[in-house]
Amino acid sequence: RFRNNSSGEEWPAQRKIIELRDWLRSNKFKKRQALVADLGGEVTLRSSIYQNENGSIRAQILFLPLANGTINHCLSFSSETLDNERLITDNLNTPYGGFYPENWNVCRKPWTRSAARLLKSHQKRIQGLELEAYEIDPVDEINQQQGVLERTNIEAGFLVPPHLQDELGR
């Protein structure tokens, strides 16, 4: 689970990542929250959440630690419609084996490294839809969505229920 990152370590000091932060700011995305999640074995996943002016698009930047000590990053744009459809456009390059909830519409573009092109693709997907402004705290929203994703995959038989994981694994 994610929690607030109060350590001050948020944006890695890498040119491309700093350029992404500046791009978000210049495109009127405002920082909402810095988050961190412990993945075990001293591996920490950091994330920064930004939101556009009217609150209809959230940007989540994931900072992924690599074995060689460098940091990779992925970007995800998400929006929700008034009828509870969740649209996600991201460039995550890690495989996902599992199921998404029926109201999620996910578009993966792992080869799109340009934030501008990824945002343009997301804006095309949400054009003409009635969007709901995000008001929930990012850490709460992300953890809720993670719970929804886990439940969906437990119900589909892809993941083992938590009470059986010690015996059977995840």
Tell where the protein language model's regions lie, with residue ranges.
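Transmembrane-cytosolic junction motif
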Residues: 1-15
